[in-house]
Amino acid sequence: MSLLKERKPKKPHYIPRPPGKPFKYKCFQCPFTCNEKSHLFNHMKYGLCKNSITLVSEQDRIPKCPKSSSLDPKQTHQPEPTSKPATSKSLLNGLSSFDPKSQQGSAKEDAKENLEMQARGAHKGPQKPALQKEMAPEAILSTQPCLDSGVRHSAFVPVGEHRLRGPEDTEATEVLANSTTKASSFHAKSAFHTPGYPWKAGSPFLPPDFPHKISSTKGFGAISPYMHPAIPEYPHPFYAEHGLAAIYSPYLLTGNTPECETTLLSVYGTQDQRHFLSPAGPIPKHLNTSPSTYDHYRFFQQYHSNLPIPYGFYRPESAFPSYSLRLPSVTGITRDQSSRLLEDATLAYPASSPSELNLSSSHRKHTECEKGSPVPEAKDPSKDGQRDAEEAKMSPRAGSAATGSPGRPSPTNFTQTSQTFEGLCDLSNKAASSGTLERLQQAEQSPTAFKPVQRGSESPHSQPPANRTESPKSLQAMNGDPPAQTGSSNSFITEAPPSSPEDHSRIGPLNLSKKLETNPAATYGPMYASNAQADTLQDLPLNLSVKDLCNAWAPRPALPGPPQGAEPAATPKTETKGSEDRTSRVETPQDKAHSRTTPDVHTEDSSDEQKQTAAVALCQLAAYSPGNVRVADEEGTVQEPTRQDVPTLSATENLEAQCDLRPKGQKRTSQRDTGKSQQGTKKPKLNDPVPRVLTLRRRTRVS
């Protein structure tokens, strides 16, 4: 075995299987076949595809005839079940002048030869001379005078011909030698093609066909006859494999066959997917020509899932443009046919146009989802609008557990919350009357992040629908007069869980632990809810997004006095809770929420500061590092030197609140954190004038 020098595997790995038996394993990029995985493994390991390809391609033409003739007597009678159909079909085209006997024999032999050449591609080189010597006698054995293919230069003649033409045997070898030189020049290319071919389809018998087609060069001696059969023959498997026939062939084949042929060859040679798009050139013209092609594409949408790669590749370039063109014009049809596409697309699209697409499709989703709930939806148009807003807000939550990603936190919810705070207020108003239900929800909150929302929307069951109609009024009242504000703020406190899922979605990307889901969102939920009214007016929920940390931190110095005064009231509670943090998690949100009740009362006076406190609360969650929080707190204290006692308390309170939250996110013991943060906050209170510098120093120390 001459090739043994190049590689280590033992000869048995490359002993061809007896040609009649089907092979279990086939190299996916060259004609090698075998029945043992280890053989194939070695073949791949030592990268012998090149060997087998070159051997099959170039040495195929020389030893192929002799080899088949050498093994002829034994092989001709072993049926080749697997590859015979393919080769015999192709041979029947070429061998139409053969008599049936010779057709069958040569087909079988060709198939066997191919398989053997594939399997034996590795050690065929040394056998060449011997096989050529054997060729004359055995070919004489199988002489069939009917095959004077001096007349016929079919693609398949040479294979059978040299085998079956005994007397002209010597001439056959000469022809083979000549054509081998010529064809090897071409076949360098085709050997290169051959790997690509199985690559594309993996159909094991295309390479076998291929050597026959090449062998046509043997008989004919010229390359052009080979090239011509190649183009009619390749396109069929090529198209059929890739499903291009369905899509491209009408255009390609109708338009310009010469160009089509050249592109086919190039595609075939390079096996580069980008070339698949080059044949697609005609299609864009078609698309532009007539509007009916939109119907054509609409027609294809149903199939595009099953269609093979080239259509998938092509679709982004033309079909999606057509999508965007059609979204306005043909919306009805698009929604009917590709509603699934659109609703899936809502995940991709919201970034670009969340308001449109999300609202449309997620409304659809949620209306379907919540139609089941017997809430009297049509009681009031404003109620309906709010309900829709709720649904729009919740739809991402219902659809996917965690909307958004750390890099880009759920644009869907940010845009929607600006439009759906009415929904929030509606929810909270309902919640005011059904507080017990909300307690239940708070208990349920940890296992089900989404249920509270549904519950919140169902709470009207326990409540006359009049309350729902109230909600717009109460919206104005919240913005207008403090008494209504206090009432609704209490409702917000109970309502923390229902509003919290939406807050989760804001905080979602940051707090990935379940524990955090219950507490922080419920903690800051009330603030959001209470600020919802002011936010609806100014669309500021967007500024609460994690992206806007800078904007949110900056306003912190303007912290209102009242909120800070109110927070110390809860300081003892939260401090005790700090230690029991993990046990009483549900209470903590409520206590903290109550601690913020007073800020809620002041919303209409200091709605801006309230917004900022909400923002700061969120940002404290977002930026876990205690240093950042302290920066904000100290800025606040600098700006309010008169209230130094209260700021100290409230800052420590804030930090403790955050330490209560942080341990859940960061698995630290709340005691230690609280101690650290208290140290951190109390120090700069002593040196008030230079809080910034100390903050920087302490930030490194604590974090």
Swiss-Prot record:
Name of the featured protein: Zinc finger protein 750
Gene Ontology BP terms: cell differentiation; epidermis development; establishment of skin barrier; membrane biogenesis; negative regulation of epithelial to mesenchymal transition; positive regulation of ceramide biosynthetic process; positive regulation of gene expression; positive regulation of transcription by RNA polymerase II
Functional summary from the UniProt entry: Transcription factor involved in epidermis differentiation. Required for terminal epidermal differentiation: acts downstream of p63/TP63 and activates expression of late epidermal differentiation genes. Specifically binds to the promoter of KLF4 and promotes its expression.
Biased composition (Low complexity): 352-361
GO molecular function: DNA-binding transcription activator activity, RNA polymerase II-specific; DNA-binding transcription repressor activity, RNA polymerase II-specific; promoter-specific chromatin binding; RNA polymerase II cis-regulatory region sequence-specific DNA binding; zinc ion binding
Pfam families given in the database record: zf-C2H2_7
InterPro entries: ZNF750, ZNF750_Znf
Native species: Mus musculus
Zinc finger (CCHC-type): 25-51
Compositional bias (Basic and acidic residues): 367-394, 574-611
Residue numbers binding Zn(2+): C27, C30, H43, C49
Alphabetical UniProt keywords: Activator, Differentiation, Metal-binding, Nucleus, Transcription, Transcription regulation, Zinc, Zinc-finger
GO CC aspect terms: nucleus
Positions with biased composition (Polar residues): 67-106, 410-421, 456-477, 639-655
Annotated stretches, region: Disordered: 64-113, 350-527, 553-614, 630-703
Bridged cysteine pairs (disulfide): none
Compartment(s) where it occurs, according to its Swiss-Prot or TrEMBL record: Nucleus
